[in-house]
């Protein structure tokens, strides 16, 4: 596993994932477990392959390889301020990530 700012050297991690062009199973944003490719350039979440935009994205840092929708993926913020201050986005925490999310924000 390549160690970078996104992966932190881990194969999987609880992350904030926001679809800038639509939704993720009914919501704009979710917090959940993501997995990383060996190179760390791709993120796998809810049967989606999200490739690093490499500076090509307008609103996101990743894009869906199949639909080309842009995504913003980042680490979970302890203050709970994961969304952009100027946006009103409903965020849901995946059931299997709730325990790890609580651990992160209470560190």
Report residues per predicted region.
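Mixed-charge, low-complexity intrinsically disordered regions
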Residues: 1-33, 42, 47-107
């Amino acid at each position: 596993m390549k160690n970078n700012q996104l992966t932190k050297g881990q194969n999987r991690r609880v992350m904030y994932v926001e679809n800038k062009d639509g939704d993720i199973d009914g919501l704009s944003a979710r917090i959940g477990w993501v997995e990383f490719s060996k190179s760390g350039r791709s993120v796998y979440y809810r049967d989606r392959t999200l490739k690093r935009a490499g500076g090509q994205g307008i609103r996101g840092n990743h894009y869906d390889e199949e639909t080309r929708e842009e995504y913003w993926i980042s680490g979970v913020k302890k203050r709970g301020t994961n969304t952009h201050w100027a946006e009103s986005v409903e965020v849901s925490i995946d059931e299997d990530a709730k325990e790890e999310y609580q651990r992160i924000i209470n560190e």
